[in-house]
Amino acid sequence: TLETHAKIARAFGRHRLAAEIGYERLAGQKALDEYNQQLIHAALRYGIEGGVVRLEVGADYYHDKVKSVEAENYIIPFVRLNLNLGTDGLCPFFEMDGDVRENSYRSLTKLNPYLLNPVFGTKSSVDYNGRFGIGGSIWRGKFDYRAYAGFSIRDNHLYWYSADVVQGSDILAAGLTMLPSMARQTVLSFNGEVTWRPASSFRTELGVHGYIYNDDETKLHNGAPAFDGNFSAHYDGRKISFGAGIWLQSTRKWSDYQLDAASGAESFGSVEVPFAADLRVNFDWKVSGGITLFAEGRNLINRRLYQYPWYPEYGANFTVGVKANF
């Protein structure tokens, strides 16, 4: 892997300009020696700080070349628009952005460690996102809120499915490997986020998100939730900080490829995982300016939490360590 980036920016009065360029080269070895990809990224931004309007606009250009495949070019618009109506309690906003993500074997194994070896994608996943809504701060800054709707177009979106060996109605081996398939997906989302600060060192946070998916280009299930949410409370002191919260996620469903060991017949089923509730806690102790001791716990109510079908996390998990800043 070879990766390099450069960025330059200039501000003059209420205006600012920024430009960025990046290059990434990925190459496989041994069983993956046929894989070679180069990704060139260039971005341009212009921003202005006005009395009523705060605006930043621009675009991102990507040149994506995978060996033995025709090169692809993508242009993704970028917008950040905030309106000042004279009150902190009501601030409309509009946002557009996106991303291009390569699907090398390295990237796919980071997303799913049960990936069939060796597999890589000859196309990158490309997202185009838009959001609009309102936000603000009321009650003398003690209550912040953000309510918005979002829409995404996801080209070459990854749909993961598991592979099983069956014999009749009996599953001989479940979830042996997982494979990605690609198709376009569109998503409409409705989101609400609030933060309440009854005191300067204490805050509570609540988030609720609902999703409507259009997966018409494939018959595969997307493995994504129709709803997720979170509620947490945090104390941030000068030396000690701690918090607790619960993260919720609706049922999810993946497709399941089944091969009959006796007849050789192929079919697709589905795997559904239950509603998830994850109770988490965290604790930080700032021993000195550069040293912090921390402890984190998750799944404290011992639920089966699935990031992938067939492979749940069992029991509570704890992490204890030291953070050092120099």
Describe these PLM feature segments.
Residues 14-16, 25-31, 52-54, 63-69, ...:
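Gram-negative outer-membrane beta-barrel proteins
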Residues 106-123, 154-185, 211-230, 249-286, ...:
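Outer-membrane beta-barrel domain signature, especially the mid-to-C-terminal portions
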Residues 1-51:
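Outer-membrane beta-barrel transmembrane domain signature of Gram-negative proteins
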Residues 43-165:
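Long, internal scaffold/assembly segments composed of regular secondary structure
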Residues 12-19, 50-57, 88-92, 140-146, ...:
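Repeated loop/turn-to-beta-strand initiation elements of outer-membrane beta-barrel proteins
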Residues 19-25, 57-63, 94-98, 147-153, ...:
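Transmembrane beta-barrel strands of outer-membrane/channel proteins
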